[in-house]
Amino acid sequence: MNTEEAIELITQNYSASEGSLIFSLHERNTFSSRQFWDLYDSIDTVVNASHHNDQLTEQISSCYQAILKMLIWHFDAKDLFTIECLPYDYPWYIDCLDYAVLAYYRKNPEILKSAGRDNAVKRYIDCLDKGSIPWSRMFTAYGTAENYCELLSALEQTTDIEQWEKNYNRLSDFEHQSTLFPPAPFVLVFLVRILQQLLRNGNADAIVKKLLDRFLYYAGLCNTAESMDHAEPLRQFSDLLNDENLLPEDYIEEDLLKIYEDPDAISDQLFYSFYYYAKIVLSEVPDILDYYKCYPDESKELRRRTENIPL
């Protein structure tokens, strides 16, 4: 994002133009993490470009106050205003915005770095879009994950336990015999989002219990992997999608057979990363359960199994 694009995006939020975070909050009562990070990036860009003027200052200040006000109203029992899809850890987003605005006013980009709020892993999870993941280039226990996007969409749209389990079982081969495969951390991102959706709507208790049972199981696998000698994980979650870590675009059956038959076909670093990033994703679940004041026993056990995660 260059300075001109950043200023334009700030102006769009100031004007509550369609597609901006403030438009979504005010007109659609919806919080979009992607739109939040777009606004955050725009402020960060003008800070690093040392671009300041009275008009921009007014726009940033107005956007900041409007966002805070709408988030506060979300908890006003006397107000009919309600924000859908508000993340359980919304104060963290407010903190991020606080530091961005403070950095602008003080003309000091180091504030953002020293604050340690720009967490790359959490941000990556926030903005992950299942439609942009190369599922067909990830191997599973029985082939590839080419149909995972459609199956995850089906899981999002059903509250019937029998149909849900049927679809879930079709994508459950990201784990087999206590082994996680490349799609695992990515699938878990969307399963955690489905959990939040179900808790927010207050329905499908049977599905919630099914998810929590599986989350506990996967967290246990991650702990087992962590307790053994292992390589360092890949530096970034997104590195899992680097070309060298995926199947060739024109892969053939022999490519899959080599992976299944040759224990050295996958590096120790890549293999451990499946567990490392899966555990990071699962570490968010206890706070989600606590936010919705439900399933305290599962929350306690999941927290025990996912503690000491740098998220």
Segment roles from a protein language model:
Residues 1-41, 54-85, 135-180, 186:
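N-terminal low-complexity, intrinsically disordered segments
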Residues 26, 41-51, 65-76, 98, ...:
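Alpha-helical repeat scaffolds in large eukaryotic proteins
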Residues 42, 123-228, 232:
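Alpha-helical solenoid scaffolds in large eukaryotic transport, assembly, and signaling factors
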Residues 44-98, 203, 215-227, 261-272, ...:
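Amphipathic protein-protein interaction modules
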Residues 60, 163-170, 208-215, 270, ...:
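Conserved hydrophobic register position within alpha-solenoid helical repeats
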Residues 66-120, 214-218, 268, 284-310:
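Amphipathic alpha-helical binding modules
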Residues 118, 122-123, 220-311:
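Long, helix-rich interaction regions
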